[in-house]
Structures are given as structure tokens and as C-alpha cells.
């Protein structure tokens, strides 16, 4: 299950944003109780791919790389 601040990669190219499969990003918003996610993806230089912030991704489009740390 994906959650806020998880590190993910994109499974397939996203022609709308220019992000390629394997591009790494961070989940910055969880929508509809986990039905969709806003992800901040980064290019090779570490810059935000801004168009990704206006795109909703489903869990089927994302692969979790690292689970967000939780503070107790």
C-alpha cells in the first residue's frame, strides 16, 4: 500500500509530463483514500518535473522503492 512521502518510480513513460519509466519521485498527496496520488517526480539533474504535480497517478502506475519513515 502506498502512502504519503513514499519514494516511488514510474512503471511506464508518461508522455503528458515527459517523465520516463524508472523516474523517481515522492508521493506528496494521497487522493480519494488511496485511489490516486500526486507525485513529485525529478529529472536527471534533480529538478522537479512540474507537470507531474498536476497529474493524478494510480498505484498501478507506480512502484514503491522506499517506505516513508514514520515518527513516533
Where are these regions (language model features)?
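Basic/aromatic-rich interaction segments and small domains that mediate binding to polyanionic partners
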Residues: 3-63, 70-71
